[in-house]
Amino acid sequence: MNERTQRERDRSTGGYPPREALADAWDEHSRYVGFAAGLFAIGILIGIALMAAGYNLLEIIEEMVGEPLFPDIGGQSRTELARFLLVNNTRAFLLSILGALTLGLLTAWAMVFNGIIVGNLGAFIASNDGIGFILVGLLPHGIFELPALFIAAGVGFRLLYRVGQRLRGSRDAILTKRYFYRTGLLVLVGWLLLVVAAVVEAFVTPALLEALFAA
């Protein structure tokens, strides 16, 4: 009996262990998570292209709104920085899910826009400090933060698709207890990745940059 068949049998007999529910949630959402990652990648390419054309988006946005896109966090302790990063990223995480209420437009825009900013900023920093600096500065926390945001966006896109299925009559209900359960577990895993990302960005990334690139 393969793993999927075993999960189906467990569900039919009333059992739904968290591990199996999480596996089902990933099976259900993985395509949409991949779609979100693809939108982000497109944004990165756009951001790099804009920097290559001479457009520094951080400077442009700062001139438009009259203040920096990113607040000054230099005076914060590591713990305060981790808390700030977690709160800020949790907002983006929740907005990516709730973007389903905008027919997915907000979710899609968040993925593309964040990709553009990362690509543009990364290209700028790499041109000044080298590709090694940007890799050390982004990868340690990015390997946790980006999958978390992609999961949130994937949940938003999948929810929108379920609404479409209900409208077409191919699904009896948009939301069910099992859907809430398994998707809630996936969302929890995604948020926990944000917690790890915030800690790494606040404590590990600065130490690595100082150790490897301090003058």
List the model feature ranges, each with a label.
Residues 59, 106-116, 202-215:
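Hydrophobic alpha-helical transmembrane segments and immediately flanking/interface helices
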Residues 62-95, 117-118, 123-134:
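Interfacial loop/helix-cap signal at membrane boundaries in integral membrane proteins
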Residues 52, 100-121:
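Transmembrane alpha-helix/helix-exit interface in multi-pass inner-membrane proteins
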Residues 35-49, 190, 195-198:
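Hydrophobic core segments of alpha-helical transmembrane domains in multi-pass membrane transport
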Residues 44-71, 112:
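Interfacial/capping segments of alpha-helical transmembrane domains
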Residues 12-32, 95-96, 171-179:
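Cytosolic juxtamembrane amphipathic/interface segments immediately preceding
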Residues 154-215:
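Terminal transmembrane helical module of multi-pass membrane proteins
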Residues 23-42, 180, 184-188:
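Alpha-helical transmembrane segments and their helix-start/interface "positive-inside/aromatic belt" motifs
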